[in-house]
Amino acid sequence: MYKILSSFVAGVAIGSGLVITYVLYNVPEPPELDLQRWWGIGTRPTEEDKSIRPFSIDFNDTVILDLKERLKNRRPFTKPLEGINSEYGMNTEYLETVLEYWLNEYNFKKRAELLNKFPHYKTRIQGLDLHFIRVKPEIKEGVQVLPLLMMHGWPSSSKEFDKVIPILTTPKHEYNIVFEVVAVDLPGYGFSEGTNKPGLNPVQIGVMMRNLMLRLGFEKFYIQAGDWGSQCATHMATLFPDQVLGLHTNMPLSSRPLSTVKLFIGALFPSLIVDAKYMDRIYPLKNLFSYILRETGYFHIQATKPDTIGVALTDSPAGLAGYLIEKMAICSNRDQLDTPHGGLENLNLDDVLDTVTINWINNCIVTSTRLYAEGFSWPEVLIVHRIPSMVPTAGINFKYEVLYQPDWILRDKFPNLVRSTVLDFGGHFAALHTPQALADDIFASAVQFLKFHDRKRNQKSS
């Protein structure tokens, strides 16, 4: 009997081990996707409009007047508790100063002029009008021009890149490369149209972005992205490795099951997972989970009931400002909760109010927050997360990025991680906060991408 029981236990152990190994290391087949799926109103027309139309940003007088009237007529806010700064969320006394600035000092017309300093366009992709900026560099002899698609996250738009675009499109004496930049508003964000159909998740947005680049004549291209843009970009690199030549992300993350196991192994043996210098960005896990629990309330609302929170934010510019500004502040420096500004003073106030204004005038807060619900409710997203991307990838981790993963975890998703940078400054909105550091890393990473492809060609020819 003992031998039978021992054999049974051994069999269960072996079987369990095989199942666990399969779950951790199995690479599923890519999902079958309709690469021309229609996201516009109604059904696909016989002939689709493929024109590329110049576009100009306009904060018109009627919209500005309505906004200012709403701000003037706002109800008094409840004051913060005694001794509380930003620990409970947006400090309403500080918010009052921001709203007064927005009402009386923010120059709507001048800000629109600044936003229009780049060439803006719209084109219809799979039924939705997508807005994008396209900036061509000065071409000098001996300098290679690399097409670069840039994608933002929530609650941003292509405006987030207005400080980094001039750096990327200007040749640098230490490099023989420069970028032609296409900075796009994700569907439902900024000046891009949102869909009226469910299912427009990061995988499907990746398909749309690939089709946008094809529309613009780029068969192959590079990508830079953060936040939701990074998720979409990672899926593009996974699904279209022959078209994406390199991926640079300021929010590199692996969601493969093995990565989760490694995270928990690190709780017992942290030195196996992460360099001692950066250990406090992950461990102890109780601190990480406490931070996640504290700061992701908005995430849970938007991933479950985006339309409900959208009702409040659509009708009140003061409410919209408080909601967006609090998240932009904490994601710029989460160590400043004990200040009235909560981290906001790491960013230029006009830049922050540009984002709030763009969300307000386009009434896009609902369509943008719906991405949180779509991003976690479709099997195809989970499938693509589990497939390694073979595209050469570079990651940069700023100090106050929302989540940090060391290279040993990142390589689960990105086996060809050709460059990894960890900085002791900066935050989630890197292009606004630290544009020079971001641009420098993009240039350096592009060199590594080119070397990767050179090695690959040499291996094929030998």
UniProtKB/Swiss-Prot annotation:
Keywords noted in UniProt: Aromatic hydrocarbons catabolism, Endoplasmic reticulum, Hydrolase, Membrane, Microsome, Transmembrane, Transmembrane helix
Reaction catalysed by this enzyme: cis-stilbene oxide + H2O = (1R,2R)-hydrobenzoin; 1-(4-methoxyphenyl)-N-methyl-N-[(3-methyloxetan-3-yl)methyl]methanamine + H2O = 2-{[(4-methoxybenzyl)(methyl)amino]methyl}-2-methylpropane-1,3-diol
Transmembrane residue ranges: 4-24
Biological processes, Gene Ontology terms: catabolic process; epoxide metabolic process
Localization per Swiss-Prot or TrEMBL: Microsome membrane; Endoplasmic reticulum membrane
Top-rank EC class of the record's enzyme: hydrolase
A GO MF term: cis-stilbene-oxide hydrolase activity
Membrane topology classification: Single-pass membrane protein
Keyword Hydrolase: yes
Listed GO CC annotations: endoplasmic reticulum membrane
EC id: 3.3.2.9
Superkingdom to which the source organism belongs: Eukaryota
Any Pfam family: EHN
Active site annotation, chain numbering: 227 (nucleophile), 372 (proton donor), 428 (proton acceptor)
Gene3D superfamilies: alpha/beta hydrolase (3.40.50.1820)
Protein's job: Catalyzes juvenile hormone hydrolysis.
Family: Belongs to the peptidase S33 family.
PANTHER family associated with the record: EPOXIDE HYDROLASE (PTHR21661:SF35), EPOXIDE HYDROLASE 1-RELATED (PTHR21661)
Descriptive protein name: Juvenile hormone epoxide hydrolase
